[in-house]
């Protein structure tokens, strides 16, 4: 299952996984799983999380290692209603709901995810996605950026 992921996706999942693997032991607790998935634009229900945890936590020790996590994410991505997921993810970033993601909004969300970015890094992320050059990211630009991964 995980072999269907691109190197870029695997690197992205590893980075997200590492953010929540506070002690660096290669495992995250099951209650952190929901937080990790939401940081990647997924929106699992409590019931879905319980099902995934049951599937992934083979030894029932309450933690999930990275290979288990990758398989889980590959499965979840395969049956994702991506249009709906993208809309939800966009709303998370677009704090004032004006239809645009500003540098300030991007910085706010990334900080909440534990990513301390410099102004230059935030500006670079906006520039990469900002096709029309207006200094912010609209929904179409966001979708194009997300699907390009």
Curated annotation (Swiss-Prot):
Induction: 5-fold induction 30 minutes after touching. Ca(2+) 1 binds at residues 21, 23, 25, 27, 32. GO terms for molecular function: calcium ion binding; enzyme regulator activity. It comes from the Eukaryota. One of its GO terms (cellular component) is cytoplasm. Ca(2+) 2 binds at residues 57, 59, 61, 63, 68. This is Calmodulin-1. Calmodulin mediates the control of a large number of enzymes, ion channels and other proteins by Ca(2+). Among the enzymes to be stimulated by the calmodulin-Ca(2+) complex are a number of protein kinases and phosphatases. High expression in stolon tips and stems, moderate in roots, and very low in leaves. Localized in the meristematic regions of the shoot and root tips, the tip of the developing tuber and the vascular zones of petiole and tuber. Not detected in mesophyll cells. Residues 8-43, 44-79, 81-116, 117-149 form the EF-hand domain. Belongs to the calmodulin family. This protein has four functional calcium-binding sites. Keywords: Acetylation, Calcium, Metal-binding, Methylation, Repeat. The keyword Transferase does not apply. Pfam families: EF-hand_7. CDD domains: EFh. The modification N-acetylalanine is found at residue 2. Ca(2+) 3 binds at residues 94, 96, 98, 105. Gene3D superfamilies: EF-hand. The modification N6,N6,N6-trimethyllysine is found at residue 116. Ca(2+) 4 binds at residues 130, 132, 134, 136, 141.
